[in-house]
Amino acid sequence: MYYQAISQCTQMLKNLESWLHKAEQHAGAKTFDVGVLITGRLAPDMKPFIYQVQSACDYVKAAAAWLSGQTPPKHEDNEQTIDEVRARIRKTVAFAESVTEAQYAGAAERKVSLSWAPGKVLGGEDYLLQMTIPNVYFHIVMAYAILRHNGVEIGKMDFLGPIHWIEA
């Protein structure tokens, strides 16, 4: 579970952070304020780019904390610039990567309660597989789609990030 919760999820956040540089390049080439992308959305009733980043970060830090027996750090949802978005991603990754594999011992059996489901809990493995991973990918995909919709030149390899090939 440690690999899926920490290594894979933090890599996706690092990929997302790398897209910010391309967003800045795109805005510079098209001569508009890159900050406009923070409020970008695909549909009028959809949450904006910044919400997608905040949510992905929140799911990663919650899984890192709850599945290792800790309380997640609180991050204010007040980012307004690309640099602040980048900082949010970096502090989330730093926290998640500070959790050791040893702290994840027993993670599958830990009980996770969610404020919107009073009186119910999820086992750690179900929480990771049914809540964390799908939500991290959902929000990162939405952030990707918003940037692409606004012309930022990112592609599938940017989404996938580094691939750890081994010799055949």
Where are the regions a protein language model picked out?
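Structural signal for well-ordered, non-membrane alpha-helices
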Residues: 13, 17-24, 61-64, 90-97, ...
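Short, contiguous alpha-helical
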Residues: 38-72, 121-158
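Helix-adjacent hinge/juxtasegments
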Residues: 61, 65-103
